[in-house]
Curated annotation (Swiss-Prot):
Entry's EC annotation: 4.3.2.10, 3.5.1.2
NCBIfam families in alphabetical order: IMP_synth_hisH
Species per Swiss-Prot/TrEMBL record: Blochmanniella pennsylvanica (strain BPEN)
Record carries keyword Amino-acid biosynthesis: yes
Disulfide bonds: none
Subunit structure: Heterodimer of HisH and HisF.
Record protein name field: Imidazole glycerol phosphate synthase subunit HisH
Length: 196
């Protein structure tokens, strides 16, 4: 299987690559359109700001390529948020607009922001992505922005407010948490994604 991790210059590439090695795969890290277009599965990890990530994708001519992708692609943390229509960061940053839902800064409800640490996910709809994962398994989060619960939400998390922890739209999958830092449940989710 040809697995490519898209290099946005603002992500935790090595930890994602290490997790995929543990699952018996040898992924390629690349920002080249010709390499990315040959992938069987794609990962779009991201850490940092939407504006920085979008600038990098634009600079590398990857925006249209990702928008038109027909292979399964998993956005991680900021990578998932980039699938949204616009981020409220810095008075508005246009993102990939794959799902027509905005990304908004989380509201303070007595919990510290950013949301950083372990939290559970709920699974309101049965889905193959969660095979072998128990209701209320813990996953590792580190974010201040989120996608509200919407039509593409397949799992949600409560942190003073409900937000999408996993989304799916066509071949686009997104996780707000970091599966590569989430122990066995995170590894199982990635394994399920790779078996699509």
């Amino acid at each position: 299987m040809n697995i490519v991790i898209i290099d946005t210059n603002c992500s935790n590439l090595l930890s994602v690559k290490t997790m995929l090695h543990r699952l018996g795969h040898n992924p390629i890290i690349s920002d080249r359109a010709d390499v990315i277009s040959q992938a069987d599965k794609l990962f779009l990890p991201g850490v940092g700001t939407a504006s920085s990530a979008m600038k990098q994708l634009k600079k590398k001519n990857l925006i249209t390529l990702i928008q038109n992708c027909t292979k399964p692609i998993l956005g991680i943390c900021l990578g998932m948020q980039l699938f949204g229509s616009i981020s409220s960061e810095n008075n508005g940053v246009n993102t990939l607009n794959i799902i027509h839902t905005p990304v908004k800064r989380m509201q303070y409800h007595g919990f510290p922001l950013p949301h950083m640490g372990w939290n559970t996910i709920t699974i309101p709809k049965k889905h193959f992505l969660f095979y072998g994962i128990k209701e209320n398994d813990y996953f590792y989060f580190a974010h201040s922005y989120c996608i509200k619960v919407c039509s593409v939400t397949i799992s949600q998390t409560n942190y003073g407010q409900l937000f999408s922890s996993v989304i799916k739209y066509k071949n686009f999958f997104g996780v707000q948490f970091h599966p590569e830092k989430s122990g066995m449940p995170g590894q199982q989710l990635v394994k399920n994604f790779l078996e699509i």
